[in-house]
């Protein structure tokens, strides 16, 4: 299934990208369908992180983000610098708005 999807993709948008998903992507682990699709994919990759601020600023997460950002045709968008998080805390780590997500996907698809 993941091979077929990867061959048809014009863009791969990871929304939301958790710390765990980003770690798997950065290190080439494929324990689930999403990360298997990522490894089989050759289309541009848009990564939209969303997690608790402490998780986002952790050195391991920042290192994984840097690894991914350095890869060809990869772009990390976000997270927001502040806002209400899913855990109920306020701070950095919030997913960017749907408008930003759509804009980034359309920009990637339109030369």
Regions found by a protein language model. Name each.
Residues 1-32, 36-46, 53-111:
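A cross-family phosphate/adenosyl-ligand binding-site feature
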């Amino acid at each position: 299934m993941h091979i077929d999807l990867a061959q048809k993709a014009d863009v791969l948008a990871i929304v939301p990208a958790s710390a765990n998903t980003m770690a798997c992507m950065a290190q080439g682990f494929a324990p689930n369908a999403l990360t298997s699709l990522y490894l089989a994919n050759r289309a541009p990759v848009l990564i939209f992180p969303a997690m608790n601020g402490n998780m986002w600023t952790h050195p391991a997460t920042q290192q994984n983000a840097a690894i991914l950002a350095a890869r060809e045709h990869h772009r990390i968008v976000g997270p927001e610098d502040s806002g209400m998080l899913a855990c109920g805390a306020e701070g950095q780590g919030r997913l960017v708005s749907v408008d930003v997500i759509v804009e980034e996907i359309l920009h990637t698809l339109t030369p």
